Swiss-Prot record:
This is tRNA(Met) cytidine acetate ligase. It is an enzyme of class 6 (ligase). One of its GO terms (molecular function) is ATP binding. Keywords: ATP-binding, Cytoplasm, Ligase, Nucleotide-binding, RNA-binding, tRNA processing, tRNA-binding.
Length: 383
């Protein structure tokens, strides 16, 4: 069996994602479609609108054969680290190819990645935004800048892939959904951005939402609790007001001095949005601040995140019979640990950061995210 891989968030899974899943299989004629998916906390520093188990099940119902969780210590990082974590997992699973969406798939990402490889160390620090440092280095090396989010992520996939001993085939395809910044759903459209889908769901605009998401996603959004940052604001505010500022300074992605600003603004802010707007300055993007806020909420220190990134692992969230057969084929040669459930030892050691992240999410979601959870086993028929 041969496998194609996708690196995803599915926040939530919409028609553009279903198109991506089906195109991945059709382009590669792969026997197994493997999805690496962020857990309950996402790359833009925010909670997933639906929990990871619901989103994994939706993926299996819409074309995935195997869903692997991208650990929180990669899932909540800037693009280059998010990409590295996902590429590592797909490579470990012996994927032949990786398919991903880009705004401009015609770009020669391989040439750009090769040209800038020697400069990577110059944009892996947190003193300025990743995008700013990245584009400065890319402009100096190639004369090209990448401004679209998925073009930048595509570049990062190429950069991560070329560090592998056996690089995979990378296949960028044109995104079918609207641009991420688009916040409205166009009339008579079957595709919408993730931002527009989330806003419609949170506003309970079901009429606008129904045409742009699969039926099972629509059911999940209309019947389950939907999470947003405002739900977690009291917990974040408590952390910032009670944790010693020296400890706050150790949180992942925290820039020097930002911990004092965050603590001061937490004294007066009444909502999460109010807090972020008060902390915002020209030096930091909203996404960067949300990632720091996520690290503060989950008490993720830079030291423990960097240590964990050196010990990636394969956490199975679900599979179809094809996915199960593929796992059986490769499991004896896996270079990374494979986990299907969390026990006491894993909770305290190897998977402790993901357990912590899930436990905080569970405060609002109300559903166990790790303990007593078994991977989904879905014999799915795609209509």
């Amino acid at each position: 069996m041969q496998a194609v891989g996708l690196i995803t968030e599915y926040n939530p899974l919409h028609n553009g994602h279903r198109y991506h899943l089906r195109q991945a299989q059709q382009l590669t004629n792969a026997d197994c479609v493997i999805v690496v998916m962020s857990g309950d906390w996402l790359q833009r520093g925010e909670p997933a609108i639906l929990d990871k188990w619901t989103r994994a099940k939706l993926a299996l119902e819409n074309g995935a054969d195997l869903v692997i969780e991208l650990p929180v210590f990669f899932a909540t990082q800037p693009a280059h680290l998010f990409a590295r974590g996902g590429i590592e997992l797909l490579s470990a699973l012996d994927c032949t190819s990786v398919v991903f969406g880009a705004e401009h798939p015609e770009l020669d990402f391989q040439r750009l990645a090769t040209a800038i490889a020697a400069r990577q160390g110059s944009f892996t620090h947190y003193n300025a935004t990743f995008a700013t440092q990245f584009n400065a280095a890319l402009q100096a090396a190639t004369g090209v800048t990448l401004t679209a989010a998925n073009d930048m992520l595509s570049f990062c996939y190429y950069a991560a892939n070329q560090t592998l001993a056996h690089p995979m085939q990378l296949l960028p395809i044109k995104r079918r959904q609207a641009d991420h910044a688009t916040t409205t759903i166009a009339a008579d459209s079957r595709y919408a951005s993730g931002t527009a889908v989330r806003q419609a769901a949170l506003a309970q605009d079901w009429a606008a939402l129904k045409p742009v998401v699969p039926a099972d996603t629509f059911t999940a959004l209309t019947t389950q609790r939907l999470q947003r940052w405002s739900d977690f604001w009291p917990f974040l505010q408590y952390q910032l007001l009670t944790v010693d500022v020296a400890r706050s300074g150790q949180y992942d992605q925290m820039a020097e001095g930002l911990e004092y600003r965050m603590q001061a603004m937490a004294q007066h802010a009444t909502t999460f949005d109010d807090f972020i707007h008060q902390v915002k300055s020209k030096r930091y993007t909203y996404t960067r601040l949300q990632r720091v806020a996520t690290a503060a909420l989950l008490q993720l220190t830079q030291a423990e995140v960097q240590k964990a990134q050196a010990h990636n692992y394969l956490r199975v969230l679900g599979f179809t019979p094809k996915g199960q057969a593929y796992l059986h084929q490769v499991k004896k040669q896996l270079p990374l640990p494979l986990y299907t459930k969390i026990n006491q030892d894993l909770r305290q050691h190897a998977l402790n950061l993901d357990y912590r992240a899930g436990r905080v999410y569970q405060l609002i979601n109300g559903q166990s995210q790790d303990l007593y959870r078994q991977p989904w086993r879905l014999p799915v028929t795609i209509g």
